[in-house]
């Protein structure tokens, strides 16, 4: 295991995105029908960080064509779309709910999601500092207003 870990770290240092490891003592199995072998494991780093939610949109292709995508922003002001880790039907339902005007005259999105901090998992950063393959479980953290935090002290 230590040898595999050392090779993995070497691959990452050389710019590779990870390593493929075959299960010990397993025979080599060719990919069938374009799927990976069950004895071949992909080892890649996963990072997570919190980003501010600034908008939302729907997907444009395939089965995610009407499913929600969350738009976040990096500290440097770069915007990127994040895929929620939800079933497509649930993403569609959330997309339908976002523009609904609530009793206070604001949208559901503005009341619940805008300016919240959301935890995003990603595979690394692009050369522009944008998360690659970003996804989220829709876990948010709402910051206390500065005035309320100061009053509590």
Briefly describe each language-model feature range:
Residues 1-130, 134-143:
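Nucleic-acid 5′ end/cap handling module spanning
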């Amino acid at each position: 295991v230590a040898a595999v870990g050392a090779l993995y770290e070497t691959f990452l240092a050389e710019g590779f995105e990870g390593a493929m490891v075959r299960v010990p003592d397993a025979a080599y199995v060719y990919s069938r029908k374009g799927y990976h072998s069950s004895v071949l494991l992909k080892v890649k780093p996963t990072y997570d960080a919190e980003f501010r939610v600034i908008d939302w949109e729907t997907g444009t292709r395939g089965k995610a064509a009407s499913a929600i995508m969350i738009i976040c922003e990096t500290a440097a002001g770069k915007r990127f779309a994040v895929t929620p880790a939800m079933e497509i039907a649930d993403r569609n339902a959330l997309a339908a709910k976002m523009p609904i005007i609530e009793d206070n005259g604001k949208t559901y999105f503005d009341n619940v999601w805008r300016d919240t901090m959301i935890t995003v998992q990603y595979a690394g950063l692009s050369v522009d500092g944008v998360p690659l393959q970003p996804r989220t479980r829709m876990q948010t953290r709402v910051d206390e207003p500065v005035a309320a935090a100061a009053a509590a002290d």
